[in-house]
């Protein structure tokens, strides 16, 4: 695929940057993480593929996002993958923060938010509402919900990816996302995501 500009908020094992370098060589990637030792350890133990264009920033994700916006930086994708759930940092959630991240997108950009939650998915329900509010304010479609189908049917614990951005409203996008997995995959459009949030509130 063609190179893209991606902002990763949360480094982890740098798995996604490696994948992007393999599938979209030449992509410009910025990784922000507060844990300097984690990033250094990962790079020492698992060096990035040759040619990877990656800038590592040690900073709070929200402060870094604000600085990038002030500098006029824009990205084709912003990926928020920081420990979430009820115990996560409160300033890295909610409609205002998601709105700040949406402002960092190019016209064709997409925001992806990885959410881990306990059984009942009450945190997910709250964040669905928050991202819906932020997307409406920014004038972009969202949120879409991507997860294991059984998990959402049972309101079971696990990980969910929420997405918002102009390209998601294009014809055939839901089908392409479902084909990508996990299988069986649930890909909920904004109306279906709102219905899921309502079901969580009633449970």
Task: Identify the function of each model-found stretch.
Residues 1-107, 121-122, 155:
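The AdoMet/dcAdoMet-binding core of the Class I SAM-like
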Residues 10, 49, 53, 67, ...:
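Serine/threonine-rich low-complexity intrinsically disordered regions
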């Amino acid at each position: 695929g063609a190179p893209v500009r991606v902002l990763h908020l949360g480094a982890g094992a740098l798995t996604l940057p490696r994948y992007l370098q393999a599938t979209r060589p030449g992509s410009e990637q910025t990784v922000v993480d507060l844990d300097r030792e984690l990033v250094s350890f990962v790079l020492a133990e698992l060096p990035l593929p040759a040619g990877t264009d990656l800038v590592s920033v040690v900073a709070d994700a929200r402060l870094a996002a604000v600085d990038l916006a002030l500098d006029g930086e824009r990205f084709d994708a912003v990926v928020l993958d920081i420990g979430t759930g009820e115990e996560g940092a409160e300033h890295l959630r909610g409609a205002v923060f998601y709105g700040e991240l949406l402002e960092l997108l190019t016209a064709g950009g997409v925001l992806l938010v990885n959410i881990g939650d306990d059984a009942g998915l009450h945190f997910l329900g709250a964040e669905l509402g928050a991202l819906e509010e932020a997307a409406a304010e920014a004038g972009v479609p969202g949120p879409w919900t991507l997860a294991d189908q059984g998990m959402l049917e049972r309101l079971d614990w696990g990980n969910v990816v929420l997405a918002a951005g102009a390209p998601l409203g294009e014809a055939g996008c839901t089908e392409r996302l479902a084909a990508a997995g996990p299988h069986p995959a649930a890909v909920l459009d904004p109306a279906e995501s709102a219905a899921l949030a309502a079901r969580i509130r009633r449970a």
